[in-house]
Amino acid sequence: MSSGSRERTAAHLRELLETEGDAVAGNTRGFNRGRYDSVAKLDDYDGLKAEARGIKEDAIERLPELIESVTGAVEDNGGTVYVADDAADANAYIAEVCADRDADRLVKSKSMTSEEIEVNDRLDERGVDVVETDLGEWVLQVADEAPSHIVAPAIHKSREGIAELFNERFDPDEPLETAEELTAFARDRLGELIEGADVGMTGANFVTADSGTLALVTSEGNARKTVTAPDTHVAVAGVEKIVPSVEDLQPFIELIGRSGTGQDITSYISLLTPPMNSPTVGFDDPETPITDGETDRDFHLVLIDNGRMAMRDDDELRETLYCIRCSACSNACANFQSVGGHAFGGETYSGGIATGWEAGIEGLDTAAEFNDLCTGCSRCTEACPVNIDIPWINTVVRDRINSGTDVNAEFLVDGLTPDAEGDGGGPGLQKRLFGNFETLAKLGSAFAPVSNWVANSTPAGYLLERVAGVDRRREFPAFRRTTLREWHAERGSDADDPEREVVLYPDPYTNYMLVDRGKAAVRLLEALDVAVTIPDVPGSGRAPLSQGMIDTATATAREVSEALGPYVDDGGDVVVIEPSDLAMFRGEYERLLPGSEFEPLAENSYEIVEYVYGLLANGADADALSDGGGESVAYHSHCQQRTLGLAEYTRAVLEECGYDVTTTDVECCGMAGSFGYKRQYYDLSMDVGENLGDQLRAADADRVVASGTSCTDQIGDLLGADPLHPVELLAPEG
């Protein structure tokens, strides 16, 4: 990305922050809080998710067979099935149906897939008036705007903005102001349009292969009207929407509303097995049928391929097809909460999962426009009702985008980037710089303190911003001349009569910059009679993986496995300070290493305070640690630490040691490794961080602590003072 492209991206994000950010943030965060509250009521949330995942895996595996089954079922019911290869094929068929009916108006409800194939434009070209009947979609149609959210397409619009739009466009007798007035006006107008329509079009949340039943999960009743009022019903759905049977709908019905909007159950759950023989009712007098049920009703199920079968054959993108379009990944994403789908989205789809959809359907160029907004924080994986590894899909797509990227000004980092990404193509300069952070850290440490002066000097700041897009408003952490490993090698272990020995993993931040927290970690473990070894081990590969440099991350993972394997094989435990590295050991290494190497390392690696909690639970003396004496602490846990389920260990240990702990509940601090250092994303990063900053200021605690390097850097910029890592509070004085 050139300097000019970075500036355009930054300007676009700033505009959305100013014009849509408040509305998007308020709504998505509300949905996200609702999800937490709603799923907490379930007896077996994880079991439901696993069941739903299993059904989708089976359905996608048997997809050709299920397409045949649903075709037979619909035809037995008297309907027609058409499997469209692509958008043009689907639109041609739908246009033919409209022509056969001599249709002047088609009304639509609940069909994102129809947005994907751009059927509105194609029918408009043929003289068919297409009317969206879902309120949010209709608002956007009137405003001529694109959706900004999978479930709530007009989430970026305020009530005041919608009132202004309606008053200007429709000039009602009395100006519309309240939400009740707006919805009443829309209901009446849409009712008239639906009643006079020739064709009704819906999508489907699910299609059952056994009976040809459509499952529609909606918050409004217009989908039912769209099905029953016109004589012709066209349902448009991707082939991935097929599940084997009606019985398979149960876990999805339990999960979809809770995951998407925080509702225990949505307003309408419709199971339709068309053609519908029920008589059309009058909207003004719903008790009186307009027809006797003997009308010439017909039904067409248009199943869309449009790249999906190729995605099914792609081992990395296949998981995208498990998506049930609930929007949980969007609502849980801190970046999406700030800018919405007009930035974090492509031609049709938005949010974390959109990268997979857009790459598979539209191509890498479209996915590249927003892929970097996924920082890999992993909060979406916990939110997803079918356990899709969304960050991995984004990483894979980023790697594929990199492979087609021309490397600009590579000579500037030649020799500083010993990665495995190949020559003549690969990640751009900015990604390559951050992906090879460990090499830069080694050099910075070797030449400290001169390197610190140079890195934070005004000329260097301007050069790095101009050439590599490193925002000069960020200050680099200071490199330390004596590394943690060097300090420990000279000092040796100081545990008295140790009961066990562990390997303390020297991540690049702790080893080369945040050496004091590493020393505190050593003292903390030794105080609990644990001897510490700090071996020569490279970085985990988190830095290159975050930039989509999978080959480099894989090579690094192998080196780490070779270095730590002997300790693990001898029964040793690996203790990790930086949560993002532990997430690599327990998560991404499963994709980068053979199972025989991944499993032992994953099973024997621990976050440091998690490990301390285990020691205390098994009889270690908490009195050996620092006494908080009732001091108040505001604690922010790292995003990946939360996804791993480890945040509570830190809270518990701090409280056991006498600290009065308040925790934050934001999904991510906004720094996300290198993300907040990048010029084009600085403003977004700080906007995300302000939510955290507000919570920390409101806590008014004596101390602020945070578990990750990114978090401490961001909080330092937000509050003007660097927080401590929990080990620095817990460790006895050295």
Language model features by range: what are they?
Residues 72, 95, 99, 113-124, ...:
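Iron-sulfur cluster-binding electron-transfer modules in prokaryotic oxidoreductases
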Residues 181-352:
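Catalytic cores of enzyme domains
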